[in-house]
Amino acid sequence: MANTPSAKKRAKQAEKRRSHNASLRSMVRTYIKNVVKAIDAKDAEKAQAAYVLAVPVIDRMADKGIIHKNKAARHKGRLNGHIKALKEAAAA
């Protein structure tokens, strides 16, 4: 437990940041989940629309350091790959 006033303040700030960051991470996961649901439903239009909404959110969280930039790029690349495969399957 923190003893000095400054340590108590830092602990309080850390807890506040932790809960805020957890909320932001949850939001990113929700956007990703919406894209995945549309892909699983084989709905290319809905998946593309959800992807367009998810990309700026993923990028913003990467810029803020909530998720690593490489993780953000990996998510975007994989989701986009799945959507492209879905469109190609629908076209074929």
Curated annotation (Swiss-Prot):
NCBIfam families, from UniProt? S20
Q: Which family, according to UniProt?
A: Belongs to the bacterial ribosomal protein bS20 family.
Q: Annotated region Disordered: where?
A: 1-23
Question: Which residues fall in a compositionally biased region of kind Basic residues?
Answer: 7-20
In its UniProt entry, what is this protein called? Small ribosomal subunit protein bS20
GO molecular-function terms, A-Z: small ribosomal subunit rRNA binding; structural constituent of ribosome
> Which UniProt keywords are listed?
Ribonucleoprotein, Ribosomal protein, RNA-binding, rRNA-binding
Q: Which Gene3D superfamilies match?
A: Ribosomal protein S20
Question: One of this protein's GO BP terms?
Answer: translation
Span of the secretion signal? Answer: none
Q: GO cellular-component terms in the record? A: cytosol; small ribosomal subunit
The job of this chain, per UniProt, is described as: Binds directly to 16S ribosomal RNA.
